[in-house]
Structure formats: structure tokens, C-alpha cells
């Protein structure tokens, strides 16, 4: 979004210039349309409950609940009072609070955050300090961290300083170089808010944002206060053909995702940000701060949406759209603002896979009332394939800890499918197709989204739609495909050793084996046992890691140390085999087993299974 357009929008909100002609939205027709979309997608995806609010020009034109807040008790969703967990939409309240403190002259966005912290110090890994500007744009340079991101009991709700002193992710890149989502970075910003204001984050949000806006059916506290507990929706997963009610998900770093709110409450927060920072005479921000939060804060390329002051940029064509998404394991939320037409949308669901409902509603409403026609651009022949084809990884993953393994679950592959079209697998649930429209720039064939390659960056980078969706190129051996293929071959041989060697041992009897050969077989068999134990325990890892590591995972991390130790023993015994008179075939097989053991040991090292463990 250009700076001129930002100024124009700001003048419109002050009444100095007329706003653009708003799309004609008939509330009854809108309700019928949204009803159809929600009912269909809820049924298709087994969603228990959803809530929707749409406003235009300070008027609520759609406020509706769908399904149940509590299926067992048959309590319907009430859009005025039912609280949904809004996940990362909570971050907007953190940024709003920090902008309030900035207005009061209590902090500056370009000051080293260590200047505001008394309970911990951000390491000086790089010469450039981390600032609030970096944290607001997710460019602080921290690796991602998922273990213990959530909690399953109130005891997990510890002071921010304690959590971050123990779990602050490593700084793995210079600040301001890459925008990659960081919950812990926002938690750090929440700690700055606490230290500067002298109030706990939840108390601050309640007193300085929720109360002034009269958001009575919203809270920043966990667990939800007793007076609101009866209004909280349950969270659900669809497992083995039925809905399963799940416990309350605590978010220890609440500033990054711990709030709960009704659809009606969120319309008041929307009005404050769509207007001049006030609602019904109660001001939470100045008009200048509201306008500033719509400005670009992190920019990469003219065809790629920027990141704003705490907000994501969802702009389509010439229409400036911004907001934020949120998600826990069970709840999914989207909060969207369109200042040019004074429109807001809030959609939230209470069941796993609810993001499909949200996507259908938002796309449907935008396509219906603010269409974004496909640009008719003549595709160019593919060029620089050697620089763009291959394997890519998201920047958003752990780097130094064992939960780095989640990167293997997010493989992205770029490959040509014709003279002017690329297929990219891994960006969405299904492969997407792109046509080149400029050097190193592509447009999706079915949507106005840009993809840009930056092959001269170090490492080469790919941007998809938004600066926050950035990827870097990886080598073949680092790719999920290569590692899975090599792992399967290795495990087949290990499994053969595990099952066949004991049979051979008893069939031939130890006394008839060459002594050195027998020791080599025993060492190889023990290594095979350790490898299969690691594989078996790895299979127990799932999304419950976000609550912390269970006993199987902790045992796994201990057993992994046995693999390289037993490989070393195997290496010594094989070296002795070469000084004996055993056959070449036996020597070759044991040597191959050592190589496989070394590869598996390297693989465990590559994925940080040998530590460090900050948990």
C-alpha cells in the first residue's frame, strides 16, 4: 500500500475527503449468503460451532451464531455473549497497548528492548539490538519454538519473565532481515509492556482497552473469570467419527494468543481501529496512532504484501485490507478490517479444521462484494530454473532444538510443469500453479497472489503473497523427500539385521562363528535395536508437543545417545574384521551397516536430537 493511499484513507476517516463509494450490502441478502456458506462448510468439515460479525459504517449488519458452544448440553452459540478463544488475534491488543504507551512518551519503537527490561536480558548475538519495531514486524531474528507453547493446567501460567528466561528462543539471524512469525517475540513485547506500565498484561488490557470499549464479553485472563466462565465455548476435535470435547488450552504467553471474546465484543475493537481510535466517546488511541498502525513496517517487494504495525496486510488489488488470524489446536479466528469502505469482519470456530469455514466465509464475502478480477497478463517463458526449482523450507521453524523436526512436516517443492508454468507443492492443502509474469515473479493461475524469487539472497529466498510467508532454498540431502527415502532404505536393512541375525546366531551357534565376526554381529544387532526404539518412540510424537514433552519423548531423547555410541562400537569391531580371515561379503555387509549407522547418527544430529533441551 502506497504512503499516498495511507494519507488518503486517514483524511477520509477525518472527514476531510469523501470515502470511496461503499459496496451496496443488503443485510438480509448478506445473511442468506453467509448462512449458506457456513452451514455447508460446517457440515462438510464436522464443525460444532461458529460465530460471525460483520459491520459497516459503525453498524452491525450481521451478527450470528451457528451450531453449539456446548454440544453435550445443546447450548447454541450466542454471538453477543459466547466467548471463543481468538488465539493470535490477541496480539493486536498487545500492539494497541504498546502504541498507547508510545503516545504517552513511555517507550520508543526504535530503542533496544533491553533498555526496558529489568528481569531478563536479550543476548547480544548480533551487533544490531532487538527493538519493538522488530518485534511488531516479526523480524526480531528469533527461531521458532513450539514445545510448551500451550499449557494444560493453570500451573503453566507463570510470569512472563520466568517463561522467557527459560525458553527465549535463540537469535539465529540479524534483526530486520527476515520477517518470520514469532510467538515468543510477541511474548517479549508483552513483557516490555508489563515492565513499562507496571501492570500485568491481562490487567493492562482489561483496564486500558476492554473496559473503555465496553467489551464486557471479552477477557485477557486465563482461566476465564468466573463471571464469564459459563459463556465460554468448549473446544472440539473430530476423532474416529465423533466430536470429542477437549480441555481449556492455556497460553502461558497470553500476550501472543491468550484472549477470549464474543463476536459482538470484537465489533467494538474493530470500530476503534476503523475510526479515529474511539468508540462512543471513549478513546483508546489517537487518530495518528490508528493511521500509523496501517503503514508498512516491513517491506520486501512491490508485488508482495507488506507487514504493518502489528497487523497483517491482506490487500487485494487496489483495496487495502488488513487484520490478523488466530488459532489454537481447536479454535480458529479471523479479524479483518477494510477502512476504505468502513467494513469489518470477524469469524471464529470451535473445532479442528474450522479454518476451512473461515476461509470460505471471507473469500465468499470479499468475492461477492469486493471482487478482485484476475489480471489478464501474458505469461512469459520460464527462466532461471536452476535458481528456483528444487526444495524449499519455511523460515518459521525451530533451528537449535529437537522440535526442528517439524520442518520435515512442511516440505515445499518447486518444479516446472510446462514452458511457462510452475507447480509448487506444500504451500496449501493441494499443489498450486503459477505463471511467470516478470523475471523471477509469478502469478497464481487461479488467484491474484504473487510469488517472487530472490536467488541472490543468502540463502536464496522465495516470497509468497506476504513478507511473512518467506522460504529459503535447501539442498537435496536436507529435503524431506531425500531423507525419507534414505531413511526407508536404512531402516529396511536395520530391520533385516534385527530379525535375521538372531536366527542365524542360533542356527550356526556362537561356537561356530569367528569370534570377531560374532562381536561385530552383536554390536550391529544392538545398534539396530537402538535405532528401532528411536523410530518407535518418534512415532509417538504429535501435536501434544505444544503442551510439553511427555515420557516417551524424554525417553526418546535419551535413547538417541545410544545410536552413535553403538555405531562407534560397531566401527571398532568392523575394523578388526578386516584383520581376520572372514569373507569379503561379511566385511562389506558390516561396513555398509556402519555407514548406515553413521548416516542415522548424522540425521539425529541434524535434527538436534542430541540437544540442547530448553525444557
Regions found by a protein language model. Name each.
Residues 35, 39-43, 99, 114, ...:
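Solvent-exposed, non-membrane alpha-helical residues enriched in polar/charged side chains
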Residues 22, 360-615:
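Peripheral terminal and inter-domain segments
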Residues 5-16:
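Bacterial N-terminal signal peptides
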Residues 324, 334-350, 461-465:
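Short, well-ordered beta-strand elements
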Amino acid at each position: 500500500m502506497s504512503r499516498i493511499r495511507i494519507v488518503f484513507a486517514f483524511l477520509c476517516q477525518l472527514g476531510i475527503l469523501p470515502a470511496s463509494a461503499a459496496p451496496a450490502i443488503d443485510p438480509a441478502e448478506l445473511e442468506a449468503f453467509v448462512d449458506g456458506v457456513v452451514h455447508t462448510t460446517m457440515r462438510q468439515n464436522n464443525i460444532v460451532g461458529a460465530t460471525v460479525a460483520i459491520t459497516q459504517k459503525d453498524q452491525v449488519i450481521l451478527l450470528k451464531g451457528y451450531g453449539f458452544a456446548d454440544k453435550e448440553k445443546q447450548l447454541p452459540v450466542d454471538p453477543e455473549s459466547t466467548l471463543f478463544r481468538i488465539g493470535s488475534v490477541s496480539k493486536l491488543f498487545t500492539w494497541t497497548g504498546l502504541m498507547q504507551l508510545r503516545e504517552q512518551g513511555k517507550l520508543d519503537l526504535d530503542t533496544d528492548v533491553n533498555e526496558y527490561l529489568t528481569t531478563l536480558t536479550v543476548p547480544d548475538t548480533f551487533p544490531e539490538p532487538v527493538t519493538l519495531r522488530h518485534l511488531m514486524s516479526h523480524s526480531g531474528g528469533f527461531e521458532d519454538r513450539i514445545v510448551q507453547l500451550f499449557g494444560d493446567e493453570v500451573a503453566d501460567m507463570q510470569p512472563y519473565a520466568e517463561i522467557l528466561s527459560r525458553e527465549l528462543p535463540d537469535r539465529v539471524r540479524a534483526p530486520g532481515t527476515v520477517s518470520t512469525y514469532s510467538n515468543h517475540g510477541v511474548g517479549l513485547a508483552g513483557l516490555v509492556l508489563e515492565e513499562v506500565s507496571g501492570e500485568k498484561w491481562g490487567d493492562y488490557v482489561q483496564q486500558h482497552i476492554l473496559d473503555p470499549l465496553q467489551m464486557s464479553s471479552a477477557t485477557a485472563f486465563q482461566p476465564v473469570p468466573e463471571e464469564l466462565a459459563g459463556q465460554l465455548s468448549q473446544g472440539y476435535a473430530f476423532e474416529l467419527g465423533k466430536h470429542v470435547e477437549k480441555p481449556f488450552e492455556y497460553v502461558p504467553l497470553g500476550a501472543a494468543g491468550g484472549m477470549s471474546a464474543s463476536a459482538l465484543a470484537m465489533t467494538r475493537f474493530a470500530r476503534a481501529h476503523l475510526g479515529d481510535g474511539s468508540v462512543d466517546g471513549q478513546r483508546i488511541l489517537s487518530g495518528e496512532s490508528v493511521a500509523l498502525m496501517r503503514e508498512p513496517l516491513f517491506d520486501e517487494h512491490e508485488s508482495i504484501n507488506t507487514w504493518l504495525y502489528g497487523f497483517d496486510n491482506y490487500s487485494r488489488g487496489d483495496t487495502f485490507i488488513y487484520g490478523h488470524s488466530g488459532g489454537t489446536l481447536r479454535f480458529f479466528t479471523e479479524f479483518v478490517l477494510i477502512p476504505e469502505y468502513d467494513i469489518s469482519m470477524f469469524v471464529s470456530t470451535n473445532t479442528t479444521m474450522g479454518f476451512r469455514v473461515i476461509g470460505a466465509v471471507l473469500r465468499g464475502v470479499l468475492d461477492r462484494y469486493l471482487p478482485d478480477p484476475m489480471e489478464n497478463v501474458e505469461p512469459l517463458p520460464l527462466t532461471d530454473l536452476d535458481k528456483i526449482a528444487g526444495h524449499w523450507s519455511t523460515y518459521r521453524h525451530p533451528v537449535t532444538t529437537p522440535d526442528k523436526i517439524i520442518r520435515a512436516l512442511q516440505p515445499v517443492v518447486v518444479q516446472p510443469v510446462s514452458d511457462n508454468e510452475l507447480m509448487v507443492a506444500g504451500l496449501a492443502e493441494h499443489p498450486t500453479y503459477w505463471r511467470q509474469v516478470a523475471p523471477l515473479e509469478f502469478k497464481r493461475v487461479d488467484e491474484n497472489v504473487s510469488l517472487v524469487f530472490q536467488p541472490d539472497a543468502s540463502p536464496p529466498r522465495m516470497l509468497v503473497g506476504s513478507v511473512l510467508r518467506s522460504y529459503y532454498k535447501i539442498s537435496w540431502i536436507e529435503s524431506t523427500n531425500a531423507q525419507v527415502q534414505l531413511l526407508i532404505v536404512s531402516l529396511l536393512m536395520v530391520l533385516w539385521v534385527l530379525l535375521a541375525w538372531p536366527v542365524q546366531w542360533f542356527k550356526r551357534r556362537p561356537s561356530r562363528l569367528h569370534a570377531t565376526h560374532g562381536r561385530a554381529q552383536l554390536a550391529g544387532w544392538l545398534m539396530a535395536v537402538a535405532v528401532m526404539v528411536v523410530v518407535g518412540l518418534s512415532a509417538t510424537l504429535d501435536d501434544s508437543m505444544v503442551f510439553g514433552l511427555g515420557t516417551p519423548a524424554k525417553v526418546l531423547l535419551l535413547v538417541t545417545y545410544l545410536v552413535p555410541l553403538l555405531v562407534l562400537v560397531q566401527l571398532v569391531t568392523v575394523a578388526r574384521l578386516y584383520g581376520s580371515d572372514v569373507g569379503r561379503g561379511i566385511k562389506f555387509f558390516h561396513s555398509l551397516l556402519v555407514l548406515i549407522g553413521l548416516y542415522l547418527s548424522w540425521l539425529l544430529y541434524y535434527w538436534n536430537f542430541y540437544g540442547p533441551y530448553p525444557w
